[in-house]
Design a protein with these regions (language model features):
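Membrane-interface extramembranous regions
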Residues: 1-121
Length: 121
């Protein structure tokens, strides 16, 4: 795995762990976002749990190589986080949100995809 993939894994871990914790704890910003996007509290908290699990899985496979369980887990997590953020962008666009509202999700989707690409290269 390249140094770029390692750095991206660490960035993804920190970003998704932070985001997921905020959703699980349902802080005021998460509450506002959930309501705006049409998600219930429990659904938004489950999204947060998925983000935390993805963050941990990306980090768990950080040093793994080849076709080991941990390497595959990292790749699946990066792919899953990419899809999660693409769906986040979709829900924001569907609500007519401005680009600045969904830019962080779009950026994380790109970073997760890049991590996967560099991981597989």
């Amino acid at each position: 795995m390249s140094a770029v993939a390692s750095i991206l894994s660490i960035i993804l871990f920190l970003a998704f762990l932070t985001s997921g914790i905020q959703k699980v704890l349902f802080n005021p910003l998460a509450s506002q976002s959930a309501g705006h996007l049409g998600f219930s509290k429990s659904a938004f908290q489950r999204i947060g749990m998925v983000e935390i699990a993805g963050a941990v899985a990306v980090m768990a496979g950080l040093a793994a190589k080849g076709t080991s369980f941990w390497a595959i887990l990292n790749e699946l997590a990066a792919g899953g986080l990419t899809v999660t953020m693409i769906l986040a962008v979709y829900f924001h666009v569907r609500k007519g949100d401005d680009v600045k509202v969904f830019a962080p999700a779009a950026g994380l989707a790109v970073l997760a995809l890049l991590e996967l690409i560099f991981r597989l290269a």
